């Protein structure tokens, strides 16, 4: 090793030394240039000792030497690791320490030779310190470096310079790009302030004082921003913060970049607490109180990496699953097209067998009824005049009777809730699709109306008017001795006008029930906007009372049927109508008494939390929902909300997000009676009435509650493993599940026990859940306040780690993006020193950007082999196709089964 050091020093100082021993020749491989030049230059040399080969690139100046790059290379000369740009020095971890030790000796030799001529300059000392930092990088931190500080992300960078050049041509003015448009040009939309700071830094480094860029200058900027070397990216980031270019970051400069990063990521609370976080960074990186930090200090903090144990576990899981998936995929590729389509068909039946048999039965009944009535009228005398028009009209009428009766059953909420909670019928009937089935039946009604009314109005009546006297003779028992004089005679008759009115009312209700109108998605300029929305949907849907009344009349006054037992409309409708009316009466009596308000909180993101006393005899399951009516807002409207409390809690709670007129007015009414929170409380406004202060209670409006009602999420009890995914306010039913699991853990000391006595009087069932993964994705940092108490409770009481919480803030750019680099650093530092997350304010660490859902499923699959996992999602529909597909893929390609359930949100 002494020969290695001596050879290196000699190469750095003596250009003329060309004779070496054979041993030295084996150690020093010819370099790329003169290491002893008086001018500044970059030189490269390769060294070999035993089986290790390393290439070192030096930045040589008159009085200092700095390592530019350190790379491990193989015998053929190709590199298998780097040092300067953050890659591992050698691939095998066992060699890392030995090689690092040798490199340190080389560095020390260089410093000693340089100092023999002159005392070490501050620059040389900083270089040596930087070298030691780089040589100490672990393999995991090098991996972090590869991903870190990306100024141009893969989403933008994959398009390359061509895309940037195209945007330049679109945004340029007189051949130059304005400073204010720099961010948009390089793909940093929405981060204009951050992009301007980048512009200023790059321009300052090049001595550019103008506020515009030419295309060549922009390309130069772009090449620096897309440099793949971590140290170069670190220098770019450091220069952006170091505005006076003195090589040091003061507390004020650190504060500015914290505020800038917080603004770019829409994190207002971090921006407000910039002073506090600046002090935290300076305390960590400047322990001697020099008043500044240097680049190598910042680098050390940026390169913090996850624990090696976790990394090894993840790697093992990933490789294990990848092998299984590869084998499965390989077998799929060898399939013939016929076998492939057959397999896809079988997969479809496996996933949708409940829906399939119900839909098959429904369609079969409709077809059978149509054919039965069609054949019946095909053999009657009226067929001789009206032909296939009357058979079509009567066949469609029979399906209409059936569907008008059936369409009421999916909305009998109390009946469905009782059946799914008390019986095993839910094992074969897809109760979760009740609303979807209601819509399908409504579509069947629309088809039946079109065929029935269309055939009568356009074919049957005209044919009867133009029938010969001989043909009409057979119709006299039905239409009278005198032939109808005109078309109007049919329309103004009882059968005619009742049918026309029903068609008009159903058309109105059907149109305003469409999502586009029900959710009021019309533009403000559209004159129909005031006529749409939930209220329009709710009131027009209640026109069914008139429709069913007219249907009874229409089905009684028939032209071609005189005997009562042949008028079958009432037979179809009797039971469903009685059942539905009974439900409405039950709801009326059950929701008569108001609930007591115990606590109110108004949170960021326009969320109102209401904590109420339980109505007498009120029992529910986690995942269910209730209807709420506030008479101060509207005396008629009921709105559904998921229950966020657990069955074992002594209160009933809901979290309501403002989305329309009714919820906006409700929030306003309760906000007026609240106060600002005291220290230690969350929310914007609060009111705690649990101590029974009657004068304060009187200020709150009266609330009526109806429910509970069954929902897909209540089926979580069927699974040992849960994957709960909530998007925004969609986390509400899942929070109740998390609290219920926690209550079982707290009450019994472990899972696998029976459910609380208060939740049901039925026979107790074992509590199945052994593991729960909860992923909550939200755009706003303030959203974490909604359920801060629950997260703290889980952290404190779940000692066995049954519940795994993952919070994701999607407004923050993904880890590795330069815009979020400082936020990630702050989070790691805050969590390490204080155990508190900077966004949620709890011990639950927040992740940035959206989750990689494939990786999430991968983790669960390898952790729970040969088990059924219940995947429960509640949120906007945008994520449903992806999660459904992933559930199917991992079910088919691993030995873990994923059952996907979606809330009707």
From Swiss-Prot:
Residues at which Ca(2+) binds: 242, 244, 246, 248, 253
Topology versus the membrane: Multi-pass membrane protein
Domain EF-hand: 229-264, 273-308
Residue segments, region EF-hand-like 2: 206-217
Domain FAD-binding FR-type: 587-715
Native organism taxonomy: Eukaryota, Viridiplantae, Streptophyta, Embryophyta, Tracheophyta
Protein's cellular compartments: Membrane
Family per record: Belongs to the RBOH (TC 5.B.1.3) family.
Ranges of the Extracellular topological domain: 377-440, 518-539, 587-717
EC number: 1.11.1.-, 1.6.3.-
Intervals, Cytoplasmic compartment: 1-355, 462-496, 561-568, 739-905
GO cellular component, one term: plasma membrane
PROSITE patterns cross-referenced by the UniProt entry: EF_HAND_1 (PS00018), EF_HAND_2 (PS50222), FAD_FR (PS51384)
Principal place of residence: membrane
Biased composition (Polar residues): 29-44, 91-108
Record's compositionally biased regions (Gly residues): 75-84
Keyword list, A-Z: Calcium, FAD, Flavoprotein, Membrane, Metal-binding, NADP, Oxidoreductase, Peroxidase, Repeat, Transmembrane, Transmembrane helix
Task performed by this protein: Calcium-dependent NADPH oxidase that generates superoxide.
Name used for this protein in its record: Respiratory burst oxidase homolog protein B
Enzyme kind, highest EC tier: oxidoreductase
């Amino acid at each position: 090793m002494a020969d290695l050091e001596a050879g290196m020093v000699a190469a750095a100082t003596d250009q003329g030394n060309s004779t070496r021993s054979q041993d030295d020749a084996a150690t020093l491989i010819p370099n790329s240039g003169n290491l002893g030049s008086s001018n500044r230059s970059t030189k490269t040399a390769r060294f070999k000792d035993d089986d290790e080969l390393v290439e070192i690139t030096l930045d040589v100046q008159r009085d200092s030497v700095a390592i530019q790059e350190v790379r491990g290379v193989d015998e053929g000369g190709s590199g298998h690791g780097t040092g300067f740009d953050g890659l591992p020095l050698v691939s095998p971890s066992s060699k890392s320490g030995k090689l690092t030790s040798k490199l340190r000796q080389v560095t020390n030799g260089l410093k000693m030779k340089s100092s023999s001529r002159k005392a070490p300059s501050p620059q040389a000392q900083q270089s040596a310190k930087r070298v030691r930092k780089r040589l100490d990088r672990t393999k995991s931190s090098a991996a972090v470096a590869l991903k870190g500080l990306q100024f141009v992300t893969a989403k933008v960078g994959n398009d390359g310079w061509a895309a940037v050049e195209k945007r330049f041509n679109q945004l340029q003015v007189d051949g130059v790009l304005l400073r204010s448009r720099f961010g948009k040009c390089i793909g940093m939309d929405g981060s204009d302030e951050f992009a301007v700071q980048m512009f200023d830094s790059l321009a300052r480094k090049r001595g550019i004082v103008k506020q515009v860029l030419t295309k060549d200058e922009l390309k130069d900027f772009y090449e620096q921003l897309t440099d793949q070397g971590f140290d170069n990216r670190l220098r770019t980031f450091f220069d952006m913060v170091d505005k006076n270019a003195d090589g040091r970051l003061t507390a004020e400069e650190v504060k500015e970049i914290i505020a800038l990063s917080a603004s770019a990521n829409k994190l207002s609370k971090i921006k407000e607490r910039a002073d506090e976080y600046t002090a935290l960074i300076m305390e960590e990186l400047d322990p001697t109180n020099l008043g500044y930090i240097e680049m190598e200090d910042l680098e050390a903090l940026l390169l913090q990496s996850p624990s090696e144990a976790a990394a090894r576990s993840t790697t093992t899981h990933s490789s294990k699953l990848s092998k299984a998936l590869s084998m499965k995929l390989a077998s799929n590729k060898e399939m013939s097209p016929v076998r492939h389509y057959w397999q896809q068909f079988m997969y479809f039946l496996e996933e949708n067998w409940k829906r399939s048999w119900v839909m098959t039965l429904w369609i079969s009944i409709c077809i059978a009824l149509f054919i039965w009535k069609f054949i019946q009228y095909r053999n009657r005398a009226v067929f001789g005049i009206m032909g296939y028009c009357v058979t079509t009209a009567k066949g469609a009428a029979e399906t209409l009777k059936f569907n008008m009766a059936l369409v009421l059953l999916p909305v009998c909420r109390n009946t469905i809730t009782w059946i799914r909670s008390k019986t095993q019928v839910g094992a074969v009937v897809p109760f979760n699709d009740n609303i979807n089935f209601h819509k399908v039946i409504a579509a069947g009604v629309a088809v039946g109306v079109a065929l029935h009314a269309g055939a009568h109005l356009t074919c049957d009546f005209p044919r009867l008017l133009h029938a010969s006297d001989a043909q009409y003779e057979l119709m006299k028992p039905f239409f009278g001795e005198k032939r109808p004089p005109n078309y109007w005679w049919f329309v103004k008759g009882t059968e005619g006008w009742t049918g026309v009115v029903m068609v008009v009312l159903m058309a109105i209700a059907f149109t305003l029930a469409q999502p586009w109108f029900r959710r009021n998605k019309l533009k403000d300029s559209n004159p129909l906007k005031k006529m749409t929305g939930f209220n329009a949907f709710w009131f027009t849907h209640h026109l069914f009372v008139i429709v069913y009344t007219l249907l009874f009349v229409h089905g009684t006054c028939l032209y071609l049927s005189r005997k009562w037992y042949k008028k079958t409309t009432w037979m179809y409708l009797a039971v469903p109508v009685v059942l539905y009316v009974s439900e409405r009466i039950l709801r009326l009596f059950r929701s008569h008494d108001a609930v007591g308000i115990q606590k109110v909180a108004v949170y960021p993101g326009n969320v109102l939390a209401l904590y109420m006393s339980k109505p007498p005899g009120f029992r529910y399951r986690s995942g269910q929902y209730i209807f709420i009516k506030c008479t101060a807002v509207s005396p008629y409207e009921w709105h559904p909300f998921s229950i966020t409390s657990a069955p074992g809690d002594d209160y009933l709670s809901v979290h309501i997000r403002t989305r329309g007129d009714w919820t906006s007015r409700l929030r306003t009414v309760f906000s007026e009676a609240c106060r600002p929170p005291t220290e230690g409380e969350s929310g914007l406004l609060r009111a705690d009435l649990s101590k029974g202060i009657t004068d304060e209670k009187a200020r709150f409006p009266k609330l009526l509650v109806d429910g509970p009602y069954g929902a897909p999420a209540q089926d979580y009890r069927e699974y040992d493993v849960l994957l709960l995914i909530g998007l925004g306010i969609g986390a509400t039913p899942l929070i109740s599940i998390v609290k219920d699991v926690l209550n079982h853990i707290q009450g019994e000391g472990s899972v696998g026990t029976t459910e609380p006595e208060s939740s049901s009087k039925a026979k107790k069932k074992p509590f199945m859940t052994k593991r729960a993964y909860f992923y909550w994705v939200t755009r706003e940092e303030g959203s974490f306040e909604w359920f801060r108490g629950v997260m703290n409770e889980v952290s404190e009481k779940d000692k066995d780690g049954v519940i795994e919480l993952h919070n994701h803030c999607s407004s923050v750019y993904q880890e590795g993006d330069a815009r979020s680099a400082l936020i990630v650093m702050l989070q790691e530092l805050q969590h390490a020193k204080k155990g508190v997350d900077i966004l949620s304010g709890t011990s639950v660490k927040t992740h940035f950007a959206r989750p990689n859902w494939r990786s999430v499923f991968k983790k669960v699959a390898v952790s729970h082999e040969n088990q059924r996992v219940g995947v429960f999602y509640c949120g906007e529909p945008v994520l449903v196709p992806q999660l459904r597909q992933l559930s199917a893929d991992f079910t088919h390609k691993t030995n873990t089964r994923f059952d996907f359930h979606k809330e009707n949100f």
